């Protein structure tokens, strides 16, 4: 056996070369958006009461209503038997007020159930639109779309949009395709109209705050206009809301607004001011007006997302940047042009 001698210089060391890794910024933004939506759902779920408390509250209200009616009837009987006609008049008034109050409670509960069904329909549509491998039939979704059309029948041009959507339907379409056609033919014109209303309201609020010197009057007027904006958006999407259901809608919208925060909006506005060379002469009132206008726009967009019967797809989701440029131009033309003159 021959002796083998190894020289370190002859030994070749293989280096493992890894391929270059590239990161796409668009993918990062999508992940951030997904995380934000997930967190919004978590916060919204945290603010939603459990079914146990809801059923308990319903049972208490039912018992209270029965007790009030029984007491009213007892007062009527006692007044008639005792020939106390003044007490009888008060008993009749109390009985009528009790019936009106119970009827109002039942009506408000009905609108809360309606809002819950609206949320369930939106959640189902969101799951169907996000599922890329969905191959189920679209007949069930056709029924859902007809239910939505029943709520929208009072709006103009809905009949034409309904005929256009039905003419494009095919039995071979799956659930996702049916929802896409319904969104394109029926809801997209409504989306355009709602965006115009949001942009107009945000611009007017910004100008009001930028020009008006009365802070308290501004706050009251902006609050009233924002409430009117949400009510107008809900009516355009065919939502019928009661007092409690409207409060619940406001709660959901404001909860998501608070979570999202205003830091990203402030950054975007700062970039626009730098690009348009407005930082040298921007005033405090103009900045406050722009901030109020952007908050109004965000409130309208969030209300739009909650009131729309079918959830937005990723490319359809409205963005505040669509309104921001129009808002800045309006404030510049109305406020800075006035100062220069």
Swiss-Prot record:
InterPro entries: DUF697, UPF0283. It is a multi-pass membrane protein. This is UPF0283 membrane protein HD_1769. It comes from the Bacteria. Belongs to the UPF0283 family. One of its GO terms (cellular component) is plasma membrane. It is found in: Cell inner membrane. Keywords: Cell inner membrane, Cell membrane, Membrane, Transmembrane, Transmembrane helix. The chain crosses the membrane at residues 57-77, 86-106, 204-224. Pfam families: DUF697. HAMAP family: UPF0283.
């Amino acid at each position: 056996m021959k002796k083998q001698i190894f020289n370190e210089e002859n030994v070749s060391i293989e280096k493992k070369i890894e391929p270059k890794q590239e990161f796409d910024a668009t993918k990062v933004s999508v992940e951030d958006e997904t995380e934000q939506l997930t967190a919004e759902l978590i916060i919204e779920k945290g603010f939603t009461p459990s079914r146990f408390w809801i059923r308990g509250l319903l049972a208490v209200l039912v018992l209270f209503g029965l007790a009030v009616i029984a007491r009213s009837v007892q007062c009527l009987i006692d007044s008639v038997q005792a020939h106390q006609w003044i007490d009888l008049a008060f008993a009749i008034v109390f009985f009528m007020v009790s019936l009106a109050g119970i009827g109002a409670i039942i009506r408000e509960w009905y609108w809360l159930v309606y809002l819950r069904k609206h949320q369930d329909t939106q959640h189902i549509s969101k799951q169907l639109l996000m599922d890329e491998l969905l191959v189920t039939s679209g007949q069930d979704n056709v029924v859902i779309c007809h239910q939505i059309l029943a709520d929208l029948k009072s709006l103009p041009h809905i009949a034409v949009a309904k005929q256009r959507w039905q003419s494009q339907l095919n039995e071979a379409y799956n659930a996702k395709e049916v929802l896409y056609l319904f969104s394109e033919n029926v809801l997209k014109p409504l989306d355009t109209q709602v965006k115009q209303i949001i942009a107009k309201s945000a611009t007017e609020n910004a100008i009001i705050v930028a020009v008006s010197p009365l802070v308290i009057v501004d706050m009251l007027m902006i609050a009233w206009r924002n409430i009117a904006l949400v009510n107008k958006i809900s009516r355009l999407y065919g939502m019928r809301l009661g007092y409690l259901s409207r409060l619940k809608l406001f709660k959901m919208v404001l909860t998501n607004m608070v979570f999202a925060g205003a830091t990203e909006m402030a950054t975007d506005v700062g970039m626009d001011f730098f690009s348009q060379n407005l930082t040298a002469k921007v005033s405090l009132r103009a900045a406050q007006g722009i901030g109020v206008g952007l908050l109004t726009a965000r409130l309208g967009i969030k209300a739009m997302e909650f009131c729309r019967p079918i959830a937005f797809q990723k490319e359809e989701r409205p963005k505040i940047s669509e309104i921001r440029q129009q808002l800045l131009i309006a404030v510049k033309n109305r406020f800075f042009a006035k100062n220069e003159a």
